[in-house]
């Protein structure tokens, strides 16, 4: 048994065969992902011109599986916890006059508010810069025909895609998969994927696991 992974940009008919089987196997309505548009415009977002990738796998000469990669415009916040501002504790000057004390308190409050506003502005700027600088891709349509499962074809497809994403200078790779697909999830995690929050609207989000992989 020889497994061969090849570029599929000129093999759209074969990709469509696999995509159809993939949807039938999932048994889920993918209209919320605009699947029909994706299907009819192949290779579309998976094309090299769009910073994508599209592969099919053969077992000997038999069509066995597929996978795609496409660029996605989302933001991944590397710092989950918001940083707190460390304010210097100034020694309290004892002032006998109540008016002076009130003025000092008001000034301190104003300074704290200004510091908080500055910090918020800095955080917003950092997030905007991070979003502009981040290059993120999404793994889609990983599928292996039932008669070829157990031959590590899925793992080979994932490995190929990750290597390509690194060569394309992507910062992160993300994906979503059904929680019931435990074998697929174990493969993803073996490559270093970790779970994180949903990155797009999915009506089946309670049944879906969202994963990300830092590539740099």
Curated annotation (Swiss-Prot):
Q: Could you cite one Gene Ontology molecular function of this protein?
A: acyltransferase activity, transferring groups other than amino-acyl groups
Specify the superkingdom: Eukaryota
Q: What is its EC number?
A: 2.3.1.-
Q: Which UniProt keywords apply?
A: Acyltransferase, Transferase
Q: Which residues form a coiled coil?
A: none
Sorted alphabetically, which PROSITE patterns does this protein's record hold?
GNAT (PS51186)
All residue ranges annotated as the N-acetyltransferase domain in the record = 1-216
Pfam families in UniProt: Acetyltransf_1 (PF00583)
> To which protein family does this belong?
Belongs to the acetyltransferase family.
Q: What is this protein called?
A: Uncharacterized N-acetyltransferase DDB_G0290199
Please name the source species: Dictyostelium discoideum (Social amoeba)
